[in-house]
């Protein structure tokens, strides 16, 4: 009943509204305030640069793209802001959203209104696994995190440790939102399929303020490898309390989130995060022959924002948005059929853009060519160490 009423109200508002200008409005729906604001804002910056570049070349279908912000501070507000963007601002579609929970909630609203929702950064399976016709995702998703983490553990980390990967005691810890639970589920599956020894799998509230008991559980389990899926605050908290508690596993591997942020390294101390691994979207210390256009993006970012990018989230959103907008420029209109036609025709091989991966949308509207990179914190910087074609450094062992 609620979905029916939402659909009716949105349809009624759209029917009675007329666009104020020939500009094409698009929603920019991210957490701009609240605990996820840093990565939300960083993600939105990539979208903004992409739109500026597209507009400088004539826009899309001859019209200028105008971004209208919506602040998805939590899941309920994501729903409210999606409704506002659609019914009041009359956007032709919505870009977002970094947070999986926000994306799942807000994309349901756009689906009911028959408008496209373009996800550029959130990773939960359910975003594109619900059978929604108008939800598209350009970036890698939870399964890709887990696959790369287990692959790197077997092929790079265990050999560097001088250990057989099957002898390692592995713990999976994760924040309990859609993001954490999706990645952890796949980690458990890939570990089991590889015959690796998982000694602990434990969730925790993303807003927790004390992880000392979890550190004790990891010690008790004898875990010498920890796989953590976390946002920034819980990444910082775990690294700090593990260090304070004298817990030093042979390897800590993050699944993006806080582990990809320079402010995380600065907050915990470069000595504390040294040699921690991170699997995530492409970051900036990478072999640029594998990621053409990356250096130009960094220069555009610095020119616009007066600083270097804070994480690769901006790059991911930038590349995904450009691919989508360039595809939309090849069709007529922004209705569901036109969007489907545009994105179904996308066929980009790996190594042709600043992310390094290719683009082709599958039957679920998921970019099936999206993939992850393996990084490590070395001397206060996050550098790419895997795969070899993208690496700029060998991995190091913690001291």
UniProtKB/Swiss-Prot annotation:
Disulfide bonds: none
Keywords, comma-separated and alphabetical: Amino-acid transport, Signal, Transport
GO biological process: amino acid transport
InterPro entries attached to this UniProt entry: BCAA_transport (IPR051010), Leu-bd (IPR028081), Leu_Ile_Val-bd (IPR000709), Peripla_BP_I (IPR028082)
UniProt key word Methyltransferase: no
Signal peptide: 1-22
Keyword Transport among record annotations: yes
Gene3D superfamilies for this protein: 3.40.50.2300
Similarity comment text for this entry: Belongs to the leucine-binding protein family.
Function: Component of an amino-acid transport system.
Protein's UniProt name: Leu/Ile/Val-binding protein homolog 7
The species this protein was found in: Brucella melitensis biotype 1 (strain ATCC 23456 / CCUG 17765 / NCTC 10094 / 16M)
């Amino acid at each position: 009943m609620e979905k029916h009423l939402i659909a009716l109200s949105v349809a009624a508002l759209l029917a009675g509204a007329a666009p104020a200008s020939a500009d094409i409005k698009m929603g920019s729906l991210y957490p701009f305030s609240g605990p996820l604001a840093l990565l939300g804002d960083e993600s939105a910056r990539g979208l903004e640069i992409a739109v500026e570049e597209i507009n400088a070349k004539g826009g899309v279908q001859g019209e200028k793209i105008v971004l209208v912000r919506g602040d998805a501070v939590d899941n309920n507000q994501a729903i409210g802001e999606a409704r506002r963007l659609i019914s009041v601002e009359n956007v032709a579609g919505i870009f977002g959203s970094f947070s999986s929970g926000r994306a799942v909630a807000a994309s349901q609203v756009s689906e009911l209104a028959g408008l496209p929702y373009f996800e550029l950064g959130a990773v939960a399976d359910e975003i594109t696994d619900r059978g929604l016709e108008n939800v598209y995702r350009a970036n890698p998703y939870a399964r890709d995190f887990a696959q790369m983490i287990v692959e790197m553990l077997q092929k790079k980390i265990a050999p560097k440790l001088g250990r057989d990967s099957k002898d390692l005691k592995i713990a999976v810890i994760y924040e309990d939102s859609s993001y954490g639970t999706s990645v952890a589920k796949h980690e458990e599956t890939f570990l089991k399929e590889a015959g690796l020894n998982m000694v602990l799998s434990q969730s925790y509230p993303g807003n927790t303020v004390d992880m000392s008991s979890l550190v004790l559980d990891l010690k008790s389990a004898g875990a010498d490898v920890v796989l953590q899926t976390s946002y920034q605050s819980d990444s910082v908290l775990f690294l700090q309390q593990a260090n304070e508690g004298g817990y030093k596993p042979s390897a800590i591997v993050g699944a993006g989130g806080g582990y990809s942020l320079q402010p995380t390294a600065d907050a915990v101390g470069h000595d504390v995060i040294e040699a921690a691994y991170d699997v995530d979207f492409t970051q900036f210390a990478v072999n640029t022959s594998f990621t053409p256009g990356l250096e130009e993006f960094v220069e555009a970012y610095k020119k616009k924002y007066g600083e270097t990018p804070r994480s690769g989230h901006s790059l991911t959103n930038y590349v995904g948005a450009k691919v989508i907008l360039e595809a939309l420029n090849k069709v007529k209109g922004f209705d569901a059929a036109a969007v489907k036609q545009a994105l179904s025709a996308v066929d980009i091989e790996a190594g042709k853009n600043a992310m390094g991966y290719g683009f082709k949308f599958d039957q679920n509207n998921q970019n099936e060519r999206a993939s992850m990179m393996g990084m490590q914190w070395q001397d206060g910087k996050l550098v790419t160490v895997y795969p070899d074609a993208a690496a700029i450094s060998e991995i190091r062992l913690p001291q």
